């Protein structure tokens, strides 16, 4: 249901209006062009959708080389807006303000509070959450398969301090900002819909970067049977 005369649309890429004249269009996680399930939608929007005044692709630095091949006349400069592909394009890379450190392996029983543990199947997520419940008193759960209402309730359970731990899939890396000091991977492999594969470095960085935000330093590491990150 879209309200009459809505001034803003906050929506998924698939549901965003493409038949309206909008002054501003912003698309987050533009590197999802490479995703095997949703990449065709991101690519179509990258190529064809523009705001009348401003178009912004967040995460676009990872797409710089690809966008550079779309037109011979593209120039990359520092302080102009991101506009049409045949005009000047600016890539702004904002450095992280806090320090993110790799701390190696740690047993779940020794992991400190304000920690997220990452797994890549519902079975793993629930098993780890149950282990934390027995050892430490409880954990919130975040998975992409949860309904928005349930996921938000779990996020609030953690953010309110009712529980000190979070167990999540890689859904935590997309648009969820929480008060985390640590992120630990219980696995570095995921099933991507076609095959079981290792996480690439950008995926590891996206998830690990949930630890510490703004001026607060963060740590990431591995736990359980997970092999060392190399």
Regions found by a protein language model. Give the residues of each.
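Conserved strand-helix element at the start of the C-terminal RecA-like helicase core
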Residues: 55-58, 111-135, 139-143
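SF2 helicase motor core recognition
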Residues: 12-21, 46, 125-126, 166-185, ...
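Conserved segment of the helicase C-terminal RecA-like domain
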Residues: 53-54, 59-65, 178-230
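Conserved RecA-like ASCE ATPase "motif II neighborhood" in helicase/translocase motors
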Residues: 6-29, 35
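Short glycine-rich substrate-engagement loop in P-loop NTPases that contacts/grips substrate
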Residues: 2-14, 97-104
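Conserved helicase motor
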Residues: 1-3, 11-16, 121-123, 141-153, ...
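Loop/turn-to-beta-strand initiation segments
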Residues: 6-8, 21-24, 51-57, 114, ...
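Post-DEXD/H (motif II) to motif III coupling segment of the RecA-like Helicase ATP-binding lobe
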Residues: 24, 31-100
């Amino acid at each position: 249901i879209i309200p009459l005369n809505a001034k803003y649309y906050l929506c998924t890429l698939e549901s965003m209006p493409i038949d309206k004249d909008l002054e501003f269009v912003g698309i987050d996680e533009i590197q999802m062009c490479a995703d095997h399930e949703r990449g065709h939608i991101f690519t179509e929007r990258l190529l064809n959708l523009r705001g009348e005044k401003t178009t912004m692709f967040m995460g676009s630095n990872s797409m710089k080389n690809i966008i550079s091949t779309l037109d011979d006349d593209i120039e990359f400069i520092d302080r102009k807006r991101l506009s049409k592909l045949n005009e000047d394009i600016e890539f702004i890379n904002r450095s992280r303000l806090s320090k993110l450190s790799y701390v190696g392996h740690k047993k779940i029983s020794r992991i400190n509070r304000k920690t997220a543990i990452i797994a890549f199947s519902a079975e793993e997520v629930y098993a780890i959450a149950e282990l934390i419940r027995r050892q430490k008193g409880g954990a919130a759960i975040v998975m992409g398969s949860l309904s928005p209402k349930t996921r938000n309730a779990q996020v609030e359970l953690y953010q309110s301090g009712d529980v000190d731990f979070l167990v999540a899939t890689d859904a935590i890396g997309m648009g969820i900002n929480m008060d985390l000091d640590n992120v630990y991977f219980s696995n570095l492999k995921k099933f991507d819909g076609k095959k079981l594969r290792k996480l690439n470095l950008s995926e590891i960085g996206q998830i690990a970067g949930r630890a510490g935000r703004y001026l607060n330093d963060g740590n990431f590491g591995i736990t359980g049977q997970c092999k060392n990150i190399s």
